[in-house]
Amino acid sequence: MVPFWAGLLVLSALPQTLGFLQHSEEPYVPGEWVLLHVVQGHIGAGNYSYLRLNHEGRIILHMQSLKGDADLYVSDKTLRPNFDTYKLQSTTCGPDVVVVPGDFLRPVGIGIYGHPSYMESEFEMKVFYDQKALAEIEIEKNSYSSDETPGQPRQSQGPEDTEEEEESILWTILIGILKIILEILF
């Protein structure tokens, strides 16, 4: 009987110990990332807190739940994303990380949800700007292949792709009609 209670005591203390270890670790931050903001807050169980992101470029949201469990929902379609209307999410019990692509429309809506398992969740979110993505865009913009001259835009292979796509659609329609005929006959 004593081993059962001792095991139960160890299991009940384990989440607190893991939580302590989790908070003491700092996330790895590459040299290309620039810290833009640090946002701290509290959120009640089952509630949302909303933020707006206006920065252009590739943005990394790194959120750590200091107490409880806060989840992260992101969208470029609505400023109030939730678990039904998000484009990106991170709902882990540990650090939540979301990479917002540079081609997302601005402003980007950020929803922070307090998990109902905890009366209150406390979080800290660090907002990073990825300079490496900007450098890659500049390199791509300024590069050209050997058959192009500098300063001229690259030509896409549009007509060939369009013909293949039209042919694929025709085959799909034809196969669909044949399936219907076979289903009627048999």
Swiss-Prot record:
- The species is Danio rerio (Zebrafish)
UniProtKB keywords: Glycoprotein, Secreted, Signal
* Record field: compositional bias (Polar residues): 142-159
List, alphabetically, the GO terms of the cellular component aspect: extracellular region
Q: Does Secreted count among this protein's keywords?
A: yes
Where is this protein found?
A: Secreted
Q: Where is the signal peptide?
A: 1-19
Name of the protein described by the UniProt record = UPF0669 protein C6orf120 homolog
| Main localization of the protein described in the UniProt heading | secreted
> Which InterPro entries did the record assign?
UPF0669 (IPR031420)
Domain of life (superkingdom): Eukaryota
